[in-house]
Regions:
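Short, Lys/Arg-rich, polar N-terminal cytosolic tail immediately upstream
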Residues: 1-9
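Membrane-water interface segments at the C-terminal ends of transmembrane alpha-helices
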Residues: 8-43, 56-156, 182-184, 188-204, ...
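Extracytoplasmic catalytic/substrate-binding loops of multi-pass membrane glycan-assembly enzymes
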Residues: 43-48, 213-216
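A short amphipathic helical element positioned immediately N-terminal to and/or at the very start
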Residues: 47-55
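Membrane-helix/interface signature in polytopic inner-membrane proteins
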Residues: 152-162, 173
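The alpha-helix within a helix-turn-helix
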Residues: 166
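Glycine/proline-centered hinge or cleavage motifs at structural transition points of membrane proteins
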Residues: 169-170, 183
Length: 216
């Protein structure tokens, strides 16, 4: 019994158990409940009335479409800014790279509402009006670390022999990037897209604070 327990503790997979339990309780189960409530009425009977009510209100549809648009723009900006940052981090010296990664991740330790209020104060200090531009800026500021880290992690683990092979075959830096680096880093890019797009499309607090109802 003791040997089995020691083997269990020494197994790497066992350390993922708390994360799996946490995800199941606070992520999977709430999502399942949302799906259940979407297709049931107050009595628990299956219905599509909830979707009918949604499509009967143009304001709700416009808000939904607008949220998708803001999420797409934010995600694209995060890719354009996050990929070069991740590339610079992955090609920096090890100690400097770790320090810079910590600096990028450090703001994530602060509550998102506090970060957003700080952004509002910054715009107010420079007398910049709140609105759509402020909203996108706040979204990018809050979620760009979620784009940088997965891309950086993928670039760090990338097999550089493919890059060397492309260079030996006469490929220029642009060709090396698009033919070797970008395809190999796509798993990190896709992870970053999911980690930015999903919270951006559903974040209400940032939109409320950075627009002050200036966008209808």
């Amino acid at each position: 019994m003791n040997k089995k327990f020691i083997v269990f503790l020494s197994s790497r997979k066992s350390w993922t158990l708390p994360y799996i339990i946490f995800s199941a309780i606070f992520v999977v189960i709430p999502l399942l409940l949302i799906v259940v409530y979407a297709f049931t009425d107050d009595n628990g009977h299956l219905t599509l009335a909830n979707f009918q009510k949604f499509f009967e209100h143009p304001e709700a549809i416009n808000t939904f479409v607008y949220s998708i648009g803001i999420a797409i723009i934010t995600t694209l900006i995060c890719i354009l800014l996050g990929y070069p940052a991740a590339w610079i981090l992955s090609n920096s010296k090890l100690n400097r790279s770790k320090t810079m990664v910590v600096l990028f991740i450090l703001p994530m330790w602060v509550n998102i509402l506090v970060r957003t209020l700080a952004t509002v104060a910054l715009f107010d200090f420079f007398s910049v009006p709140l609105g759509e531009g402020a909203l996108i800026f706040g979204m990018v500021y809050n979620f760009i670390p979620f784009m940088i880290y997965p891309i950086y992690n993928t670039l760090q683990k990338m097999d550089h022999s493919y890059i060397e092979a492309a260079q030996d075959l006469g490929a220029n830096p642009v060709q090396v990037f698009f033919k070797a680096v970008l395809p190999l880093s796509m798993p990190g890019v896709m992870s970053g897209i999911m980690m930015v797009f999903m919270p951006t499309i559903s974040t209400f607090a940032i939109a409320e604070l950075l627009t002050m109802n200036n966008i209808k």
